[in-house]
Amino acid sequence: MLLDTIHSRQDLLDIPEDQLGTLCGEIRQFLVQNVSRTGGHLASNLGIVETTVAIHRVFDTSRDRLVFDVGHQCYVHKMLTGRMDRFDTLRQRGGLSGFPKPCESVHDAFIAGHASNAVSVALGMARARTMEGADYHVLALMGDGALTGGLAYEGFNNAGASREPMIVLLNDNGMSITPNVGAISRYLAQARLRPKYLDLKLWYRQTTAKSAFGRRLYALTHKVKEHMRRSILGTTLFENLGFTYLGPVDGHDISRIEMLLKTAVALHEPVLIHLITKKGRGYAPAEKTPQEFHGIGKFDPETGLSETVSVPTFSDIFGQELGRMAASDKTVCAITAAMQHGTGLDQFAADFPSRFFDVGIAEGHAVCMAAGLAKQGMKPVAAIYSTFLQRAYDMLLHDVALQQLHVVLAVDRCGIVGEDGDTHQGMFDVGYLRQVPGMKIFSPASFAELREDLHTAFYACTGPAAIRYPRGAEGCYQVSASQTCIREGYTCTIICYGTMVNAVLSAADTMQAAGYRPEILKLRTISPIDWSTIEASARKTKHVFVFEETSDRECLADEIFAHLIEHGIPAVCCKRNLGRGFIPHGAPAALLAAAGLDADALTKLMQEELS
């Protein structure tokens, strides 16, 4: 196989052009076989194969800087930069990350996990290159979905005005960006890219730059040429922002892409190359339903059928209950930021299209729009992943909390998310949400509690409310408890919230078998806090443990311990959480065990503290 011969960039360059199609087929076969065993982002990587091969044939990413937007389409890049032999560890703890990681390879220029930032990052690198007098190239590879985020346009606006040489490759696999303006447009676009034309253009620019008269002549003729071209073709948004636009072009034509990349380098200015690709290309199941293969678990590569048994998730229950509420209340509406399927809102969108709003990758806008809806008497819920809601923090404070508007946040993927790693773990929402004045925060531990909390947030709250819940299914705790104390005892007090209760109950059972009688307090809301129950329990047991699936910074335990001290309640206090760093990728159970938050580790900690 050709793929087996690639151990360096030179090996890739040595492959004859007429065999590159065969190589791309082998890459796709490798991706399907490996991702079927580990899970991962498949469809987007199948669609970017030829583009990635072309990039690595033109540029040396050990010195040139390739910045990914989002980053989940980096698998082919990793294969071509010496990491094929580690793909059996993809997204596993201690294994290959599913996103770019500079600590993993010199070829990974920048960590990427969130969207729409690549142009800004690339501009910073291009400016650094100019400041240090270096000569490396800077590229940003972004999908068309990233253009739904406003940050991308901030980057384009500044980069175009800067005139810093940089290349943005736009991988367009679905969204129409440039209108089709017919045969003249195609002919002129192709003519502008012919080598003889480009050589003449560069010669003319260099020649006229040698004198003041020449520079004035170039400026005049350039204006005349641009006026004529735009009169015929019109302009793209990117050209209006200062980029030279090349395309659209077939993103599966390697020779064509290579020619465009070399052209972009020669132009020595901000250039956008518009590539049209097919998501899931080369694998029939992914071509048929690319959404299902965007991020997928283990599957049968022959049929494309998932090996994962489908069970209801917190996201599913949220979407179902919200739909029931919307059926009887016409003011209920839902907003999501490009995560309709992930947040469980597919059916809601189908049943209530006039009350469902997918705003794209624009979390700040989502929260602001929710504020406007609430101000006019609607009941909006913004369903956003914990890690992405971070991007809307200013809007939570300024546009929602300041006016105490009744906006409900459905904060999905809280706590350990798993294989997507540190860019996606939901470990900071407890800290940043509790800082928002007037924000009521629910943390349901079961589906039943989620349903009740959703109704409470809509009909018993008057200001902002957040309901935080994890990815996946509920655990052994499946009831709904209105009281904070769910198990009475006297040996010690264990305080927890959310699905952390499952490990706590298991640990408490082991403790009880060993002769201890722990009291368990499960907080239904973490803001406000049920202080009276906590105070009474601490006075009784005089030993308090707080276990949380959140960052140590701004954790609930610190506030609880400070409260007990301030109120003169003597108690030995002990906490355990996810710590102060970032949590890498891996299976959730393995990551929780590594953090000491599984039942066995909690049992050991409590027995040591109480002995």
Question: At which residue positions do the language-model features occur?
Answer:
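Cofactor-binding active-site loop characterized by glycine-rich and histidine/acidic residues
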Residues: 41-162, 314, 332, 336-337, ...
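Surface-exposed loop/turn segments flanking beta-strands in extracellular/periplasmic regions
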Residues: 294-303
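Catalytic cores of secreted or luminal carbohydrate-active enzymes
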Residues: 442, 457-459
